[in-house]
């Protein structure tokens, strides 16, 4: 199978996904289920397996999804890790912070740089991972409440240990 990547299409997909992610109001301490469900469906449609972990109230959720290696050779997986929450919106916004806005070749929106932009890029590249003969698993690890006290990551780490999921390269 060819590993050639159409960078223009990858860029366009990244912008489309990022625009979608910005539309989810995932301020620290608030519900992020809709964003996680979006990411999970996107990855599962590509053949990934996934599971979620929750806070005690089940209003904030982590996602761990895996695109399995086709030819595993025992090498450590790659973990693409990011957080889904954003800081609260300040009053100085001149546009809707939850609608991606492009001005002078720059995209603006809450979380576009920290860290929904990275998550969008990982999701945009996921179709490539799903089609090539990977020699290692690719994990997608998306957590909640990094902006405040990193509350989501410890919950996910506990579950990873229970499932004996191998650490990897982040």
Language model region names:
Residues 115-170:
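Acidic/histidine-rich catalytic neighborhood of metal-dependent amide-processing enzymes
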Residues 2-110, 129-135:
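Acidic/His- and Gly-rich active-site-bordering loop/insert found
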């Amino acid at each position: 199978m060819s590993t050639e990547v159409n960078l223009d299409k990858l860029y366009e997909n990244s912008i489309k996904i990022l625009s979608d992610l910005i539309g989810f109001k995932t301020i620290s301490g608030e519900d992020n289920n809709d964003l996680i469900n979006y990411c999970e469906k996107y990855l599962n449609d590509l053949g990934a397996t996934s599971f979620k972990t929750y806070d005690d109230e089940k209003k904030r959720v982590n996602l761990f999804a895996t695109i399995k290696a086709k030819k595993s050779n025992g090498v450590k997986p790659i973990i693409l890790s990011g957080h889904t929450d954003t800081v609260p919106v300040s009053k100085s916004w001149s546009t809707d912070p939850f609608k991606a806005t492009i001005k002078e070749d720059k995209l603006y929106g809450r979380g576009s740089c920290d860290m929904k932009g990275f998550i969008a890029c990982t999701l945009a590249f996921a179709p490539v991972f799903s089609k090539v003969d990977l020699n290692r698993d690719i994990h997608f690890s998306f957590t909640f409440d990094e902006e405040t006290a990193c509350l989501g990551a410890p919950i996910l780490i506990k579950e990873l240990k229970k499932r004996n999921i191998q650490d990897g390269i982040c």
